[in-house]
From Swiss-Prot:
InterPro entries reported for this sequence: CASP_dom
Listed name of the protein: CASP-like protein UU1
Organism: Physcomitrium patens (Spreading-leaved earth moss)
Keyword DNA damage belongs to the record: no
Side of membrane Cytoplasmic, spans: 1-170, 244-261, 329-336
Family: Belongs to the Casparian strip membrane proteins (CASP) family.
Main location: membrane
Subunit details: Homodimer and heterodimers.
Length: 336
């Protein structure tokens, strides 16, 4: 809009309080229809001309710029006389136009402040209008801000079904407990039978005797050692399952933890080691059976050796089943 004679060239619409002010103070809604306004210095002529315009809204936010201060009767430079000497109609039109612009700015400020104080910006209006990919994930509503100004974290993209996970943990846990118990039973029986493999053979009239023990066969020593290791390992795993049950309410830990991965590796290693030693002991027992030693009183030696090797094979089967259960559970959970 054009400037009147003698006005400061720097004053324009951008210099009005609605564009220039950065601090909002207390809102005063005061009618100036009577020519009275708090803090304003108006001369009689200005009061008369000012009363011809509509009522204005005063926003208490600090000093006004030169152009607005001039409309309230304050001097604004050497052009004051020239403005007062202008025609009454032109000056009245200019003053009313500026007051109208100021009224609009003040009312916009007052409406915005009232809206913010009444919580209009906390409504869900904009959340409902959100489009997919803009401001919300998949068009869902964004969470409202907290009281202290911190924005709440967005909702999780995917939540694992807790009920189904608990059922799977209980199912796999029951299977693992049964397999661990079977490993302990068969390894204990195998090492007990192998440890009792001792026999003394006496000749006629006890002129001579011959002692035989499992320590004389290397493969028997190997299978006995693996039975002890697997038995201790199964006992430790069984105790850890019960500790996990008492602490977290489930028999198995998460397959993504280090303990679960180590358990899977140890199951695989011990299973292969046990089946290897059991196979070697089975070969030795077969060779002893083919000879002439398994006759008479020596039959018990061959039977005990074969029984101990058989128990080791059963223990291997249950240990391999445990490793398979852990692998299936790992693939089932990570593949969801």
């Amino acid at each position: 809009m054009g400037k009147g004679p003698g006005l400061d060239p720097s004053w324009s619409l951008a210099g009005t309080p609605c564009f220039k002010s950065t601090r909002l103070g207390k809102t005063h809604l005061e009618s100036t229809a009577g020519g009275a306004q708090t803090g304003a210095r108006l001369d009689p002529v200005q009061i008369a001309r000012h009363s011809m315009c509509s009522s204005s809204v005063r926003l208490d936010h600090g000093p006004l710029p030169v152009g607005v201060a001039a409309m309230q009767g304050e001097t604004f430079g050497p052009g004051a006389d020239s403005q007062r000497s202008a025609s009454g109609a032109e000056y009245q039109q200019l003053t009313c136009a500026r007051l109208s612009v100021r009224d609009i700015c003040y009312k916009l400020h007052a409406a915005a402040r009232i809206s913010m104080e009444s919580g209009a910006w906390d409504s869900e209006y904009f959340d409902k209008r959100a489009t997919p990919g803009v401001g919300a994930v998949g068009g869902s509503k964004m969470p409202p801000p907290h009281a202290h100004g911190a924005v709440a974290p967005p909702p999780a993209m995917y939540n694992n079904p807790a009920m189904e996970s608990n059922k799977d943990d209980n199912f796999f846990g029951a299977i693992v407990l049964s397999l661990r118990a079977a490993q302990i039973v068969f390894t204990v029986v195998g090492l007990g039978v192998m440890g009792s493999l001792k026999h003394t053979s006496h000749g006629d009239y006890y002129y001579y005797y011959y002692d035989f023990s499992f320590t004389q066969v290397d493969s028997y020593i190997g299978v006995l050692s693996l039975d002890v290791i697997v038995c201790l390992y199964a006992i430790v795993q069984l105790v850890l399952c019960f500790i996990q049950r008492s602490n977290q309410g489930k028999y198995l830990s998460s397959p993504t933890t280090v303990a679960a991965k180590l358990t899977f590796v140890f199951d695989q290693v011990l299973a292969y080691a046990l089946v290897a030693t059991a196979g070697a002991a089975a070969g030795s027992a077969l060779e002893i059976r083919k000879g002439t030693s398994c006759s008479g009183t020596w039959t018990v030696i061959c039977s005990k050796g074969e029984a101990s090797v058989a128990m080791s094979f059963f223990a291997f089967a249950f240990l391999a089943a445990t490793a398979a259960v852990y692998s299936v559970r790992l693939l089932r959970i990570t593949g969801r």
